[in-house]
Amino acid sequence: DMGIAIFSLEMSAEQLATRMLSSLAMVDSKNLRNGNISVDEWTSLATAAGKLCGYNMYIDDTSGITVQQMKAKLRRKKNIGLVIVDYLQLMQTTLKTDNRVQIIAEITRQMKIMAKELDVPIILLSQLSRAVESRTDKRPMLSDLRESGSIEQDADIVLFLYRDCLLYTSPSP
C-alpha cells in the first residue's frame, strides 16, 4: 500500500491530525478543540480515528525544512506514493542570498529534481500575493503566486482553489 508523506511547515502534526479527524468525522473542529461533542459526534470521531490509523501516512512538522532534509527523510520511508508540502514560502535553502525570488526559484528547482529522483509526485502548496485582493476579479492567476516565476516554470501543473460563492455573496440581513 502506497503512503502519503505530509510536510507541514505551518501547523504542528497534532493540529493537522485534529483537522483531518474533524474533517473525516464531519465534526466542527472548534467543538473538537473545546470538547463540546455530542454522543453521535463521539461515535463519528471514533470511526474516523480508526480509519486515520489505518492510513499509511507520515506527517513531519519540522519548521524551516530544506529540500535536502526532506529528501533524506523520504529516502528512509518506504512506499511513499505522494508528497504534500504546506507550504513553499516557509521552506529554507542553503542559498546565501536575501533575494526571495532566487530562494523560491532554488527551492522549486530542487523539488522538481527530488520528485524525479524519488519518482514521486509532489503537491507543493504556495501562498498567493496580496495583488489578488486589489482586483475586481478575484480569480487567481499565475502572476499571483508569491515570489513566482519559477513556480510556474518548474511545476507540471498549477492549480488554484477558488469559490465564487464565497467572494460574491451578499451578507445576510
Model-found features: residue ranges?
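Short, electropositive alpha-helical surface patch
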Residues: 132-152
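Substrate-engagement module of ASCE P-loop NTPases
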Residues: 103-122, 147-154
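Conserved nucleotide-binding/hydrolysis micro-motifs of P-loop NTPases
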Residues: 11-14, 64-66, 89-91, 128-132, ...
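Conserved P-loop NTPase nucleotide-binding/switch module
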Residues: 19-26, 89-109, 135
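Well-ordered beta-strand positions
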Residues: 157-159
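Cytosolic-facing regulatory segments adjacent to core modules
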Residues: 3-79, 93
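Conserved small/polar residues in nucleotide/adenosyl-binding loops
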Residues: 168-173
